[in-house]
Amino acid sequence: MAEMHPLLARARERARYSQDDVGAALGVSRAMVSYWEAGSRSPNDRQLASLARLYGVELSDLLEGRDAEPVGIDLTGMLLRADNAVGPESAPGLQEFVQFLERYAELSGLTKMPIRGMTQSPYVYRSKFSQKDDARRKAEEVRAHLGLGAGPISDTDTVCEMLGITIYRAPLGGDLRKAPSGAFLNHPSVGFSILVNLDMTPGRRRFTVAHEIAHALFHSSEERWVISHGRGPREDFADEFAGEFLMPSEGVRRFMEEVGMPPRITEDVDVIHIQRYFRVSFPTALVRLKQMNAITAATYHELRREVRPVALARSLGYRIDPEEYQQDAERWRIRRFPRAFLRMLRQAVVGEVMSPPSAAAFSGLSIADVVQILGQPLAGTDEPEGTEVEFAEYEDSGVVPRA
């Protein structure tokens, strides 16, 4: 048994867990994990089996002191144990998330295309020394780093790519009293990765992306994984960050002033214009304006109860996304994957590393989906191209000479 103790430390370090992580997973103190690794105490049989699963090694290797490579870290189990209040209906989505990350790492090796994932945050945040305006200042800091200023964010997926954060979407359950809105995981091979609950409304999903970015950038030094469920200081910070990141106070007030809105809003059309400008949902905009004291509590409840935001936005000339009326899971068959993964999958087929059927089996997509990723028209369809007409318009107007 004496030879096992140094092996415990090496297996933990290879799996990129801290002693705090292991203690939290097994329900023991960090000091106890340290005693195990130092050899002053020994884990019991149940704890040893849990350590083997956690580190992704065979139990027999630990018992016999063999320094074997991990065979598969139980990341799904870690996510499920991170919040005991999460219902069992969320387990398949969490497992799908972890399995996707493993396939992503495998595909990177097959295609020789690196995953440019962040593994350590450049941002400093110490929760023990938090101030009231920390979330606002941190959101401003990240926006400044990305060159976003105080204006709207057109695409949160692009923001994740710029930060080196992998984003994946999977169904976790629609009842947020039992289901998480999302999760963060610092994956051993992929790096910072976030999961968004696909069962939520489009507006809530967008908010969750910003919320999980907060966990990745500001809580990853303390936690390797976070399940976004329930309340607490960490969740409160991530919520405040998300609101400020999507609708910065400075940007909202500047927009209101530039278009001639009063400092205290009472009209439903003003909320619609703010919502559409910042590309968030009506509930997100209304909640954010209430947080900023730009509307009173009475106005908030009145607009929440009486406004039909999609119909009103349409009457004001705004383009309406079909999902604003009804969610459509079919639209997310391909879009649930990060773009970098889709680029790799396409390269695997183009480079003849995989055939279309094998790429479909590998990714869980249909062959028709893979054909679509390749940029080819689907069989039996005639997809009109408007690009030739547009090129002719540039040439006819003299913007560029004809070839």
Where do the protein language model's features map onto the residues?
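Short juxta-domain linker segments that transition from a proline/glycine-rich
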Residues: 1-403
